Every structure is written in C-alpha cells, then in structure tokens.
C-alpha cells in the first residue's frame, strides 16, 4: 500500500509541483491550501507524513503542527520562506521532525521524505539491532520493544525521534556523541538538516525526563563537542 502524504502550502503552484513529483515516487498525495483545511484533511486521511508550510491563511503552520501533535505522531516537515532560526527552532519545539527553507530542491525534499518515513516506520527490532531487554538508568527504564520509557513508574510521552535519540545515547552510555554523528545515526545518513535540530530535540528530551532541565543529570552537554548520557551507579 502506498504511503500517504499531505502537502499544505498556500502557494498552489508549489503544492502542485510537490504533488506531481511525490506521485511520481509512488505516494498518494493530498493537498490543502490553508491551515483550517489542513487540520481537517490530516484528521480525515491520517497520512504517513505531512509537509507543512509555516505561512498559511487561517491557522498558521505552527498552530496546525501543535494541533496535529495532540493526536498524531507522524513525521512533520516544516516548509518556510523565512530564513530565520526562530521559525525553524520553534517549529521543531512544537513537534516537527524536520524543516526545509524555500526555495528548496524537490529532489532534496523527496530525499528527506524518504529518510523520515524510513526512520519513523522501520521495525523496532531492526532499529535496536535485536535488543529486547529493558535498560535501566537510575530512575528511568527504557523498553525498546514497546518504544516506551518510564520514570519512577510513570510513562514519559516521547515522540518517535525523541525515543530514538535517548535510546541511542543509552546504548553508548558515557560516550560523547557529536551533533554531526547524531544527525547521521538517528536522523539518517541522507539527512540534510543542521546541528541545531539535535540541540532542540535534546532540549525537548530534558524537559520531559529531567527533574531540573537547567541542571541535567541524565543528558549532559560536553561544551564544544556534543552530548552524552551520564552513567549512574
């Protein structure tokens, strides 16, 4: 069965180009041209991935992303004409998985679509190299097979990408990982984003798992190098 893609862009020529090229790749494509219709379309079609413009009439892309994340975990790639770190970072903090700045290469965007779909929907047994055992880190228990984490017995709601990042760090406890390395291994080798994506995802993780995110005891920064998961006896 073909993967479903929802394209949301108020510039119809751009949406048409994306629809044409994505259909050539074998995807089922549905388009919306404003924020309100986008939410309705996503709820109706329940796509496998969403390409979401930031600047939209009605609800903007940020509002749409926030609304969709209340119910769904499919990858969301933000499309922005504003070459602004604020927009990019805010989009990721709301739960977007990736972003592309206009003008963009259709070939690059399709590569990102494939990378996000592959990473999000690949089988857990493959992604964790057959690991089935629980991983305990102080008060946190990771359940690889269930793609879930608990802290002091309480479930921690993580996105797919957040889980992958935390689980990867847990398999390399105490080892400092550069942002570039994490982009390659967690986001995929053909990921075209910048290292700021890692920083934002780390910040989201800390807000969910740390007692005091400003003084983390699990995910530690090695300034100028990267991140590592602190060992606990």
UniProtKB/Swiss-Prot annotation:
Q: Name one GO biological process term.
A: regulation of DNA-templated transcription
Q: What's the chief localization of this chain?
A: cytoplasm
The entry's cellular-component GO terms read: cytosol; protein-DNA complex
- Tell me the domain of life: Bacteria
Q: Which UniProt keywords apply?
A: Activator, Cytoplasm, DNA-binding, Phosphoprotein, Transcription, Transcription regulation, Two-component regulatory system
Query: Where is this protein found?
Result: Cytoplasm
The reply on keyword Glycosyltransferase is: no
Mind telling me how this protein is modified after translation? Phosphorylated by WalK.
Q: Which residues bind DNA?
A: 132-231
Q: Which NCBIfam families match?
A: resp_reg_YycF
Q: Describe the function of this protein.
A: Member of the two-component regulatory system WalK/WalR.
Name of the molecule in the record: Transcriptional regulatory protein WalR
Gene symbol here is walR
